């Protein structure tokens, strides 16, 4: 009898440990603490993209957008910058990371909402061009966006203090110089 309980307890412990160790979000989801998008943990992506701008999580755009963005013609005018990689292998590794973690390949809630807002062939090059993100920011007065602490909606971390951790939750929004909160 003791052996049976020991076996069941061991299997239960192994099951929960495997949930915890296999993916950051599975264990958290079990307890209702789901992240919005997968945080960026890829050192190459952080170095190559994060050196110039906030390293936007791949889960904020579909794979087709990342593929379009990484084409040579798009890289020649990447939001006003000419992007050149020292090696083609770097470009391939970055694209692979982006596609693997893109919104259409992600189980995270914000990624799913972004995908639901897009039509089948939409491939926006900017996160701000996705209908979901546009809707979420539509009620924010321009004067709050234009203030020096924010400057532009592409400055996610100005208001989303935990953006780098993949948390864009409404409860974590702090618009500089206000006590305002914007919710769904």
Question: Which ranges hold each PLM region?
Answer:
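N-terminal signal peptide c-region/cleavage motif recognized by signal peptidases
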Residues: 16-18
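Sequence context surrounding c-type heme c attachment/ligation sites in exported
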Residues: 24-50, 55-92, 96, 102-184
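Bacterial N-terminal signal peptides that target proteins for export
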Residues: 1-9
């Amino acid at each position: 009898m003791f052996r049976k309980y020991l076996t069941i307890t061991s299997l239960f412990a192994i099951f929960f440990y495997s949930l915890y160790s296999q993916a950051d979000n599975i264990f958290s989801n079990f307890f209702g603490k789901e992240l919005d998008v997968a945080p960026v943990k890829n050192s190459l992506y952080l170095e190559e993209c994060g050196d110039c701008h906030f390293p936007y999580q791949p889960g904020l755009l579909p794979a087709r957008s990342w593929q379009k963005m990484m084409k040579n013609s798009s890289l020649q005018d990447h939001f006003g910058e000419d992007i050149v990689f020292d090696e083609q292998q770097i470009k391939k590794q970055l694209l692979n990371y982006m596609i693997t973690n893109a919104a259409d390949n992600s189980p995270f809630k914000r990624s799913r909402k972004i995908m639901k807002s897009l039509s089948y062939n939409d491939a926006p090059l900017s996160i701000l061009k996705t209908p979901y993100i546009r809707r979420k920011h539509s009620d924010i007065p321009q004067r709050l966006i234009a203030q020096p602490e924010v400057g532009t909606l592409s400055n996610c971390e100005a208001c989303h203090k935990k953006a780098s951790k993949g948390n864009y939750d409404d409860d974590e929004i702090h618009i500089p110089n206000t006590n305002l909160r914007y919710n769904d």
